[in-house]
Amino acid sequence: EAAAPLIGEAQLVVGSTTSGCRRSGKGELIVSGEGRTQLGTLDASPAPTWLSPWRQGVPDFEWETDIRSVLLAKVALNAVINPLTALRGVTNGELMQPPLRAITEEVIEEVQSLLRTADAREIASALPEQVRAVCDSTAANHSSMRVDLEGGKRTEIDAIVGWLLSNLTPQPPSTPVLSELYGAVKERDLRVSRA
């Protein structure tokens, strides 16, 4: 949404992917998961003509006419996993194990509450299983927020949790655990900014 005014008449294509990679200690990129890529436009336009040749380079790909829902589901998922793994210094899979399972479930419930208030009930209903599936399938992975925090870099906390708390709905419900996680990561980000 922020980029749209900057591009004039050009068509803005946005997307989400479940593919992932990380840098090795030597700076090489290592594929940590091959997944699905979804693209679309915010105005629900049909697929552009350039898509056919582009599709050949991306194995599991889909054009989505409702990309907003795809992006919201991804933000909701990341709002649960990323701050917890970053602040606790754990892998994705550890979130579904004691002692972190209880707080993970609390955060899921708070994000679901935000989604329901914004009338995104289907995304809210799917969130618990989506979190479990991602934590299982990427059990050994480190979230990007954890990598950024441990590397002394600024995180995407504002674009993920900050956006959910501030922009999803005009009157958000109480989210004490999620808000506390947001504040803790923000504080670390501020320290990075000052350094």
Ranges and model annotations:
Residues 47-83, 130:
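FAD/FMN-dependent oxidoreductases across multiple families
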Residues 68-112:
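Active-site-proximal catalytic alpha-helix in oxidoreductases
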Residues 105-195:
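NAD(P)-dependent Rossmann-like dehydrogenase/reductase catalytic/cofactor-binding core
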Residues 28-38, 86-96, 141-151:
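Helix-loop-beta segment of a Rossmann-like dinucleotide-binding subdomain
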Residues 7-10, 57-59, 169-170:
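Short glycine/proline-enriched coil/turn segments at helix->beta-strand junctions
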Residues 16-18, 33, 43, 65:
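Residues at the C-termini of beta-strands that transition into short coil/loop
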Residues 1-28:
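Rossmann-like NAD(P)(H) cofactor-binding subdomain of soluble oxidoreductases
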Residues 27-54, 101:
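Short beta-strand and adjoining strand-loop segment in the mid-core
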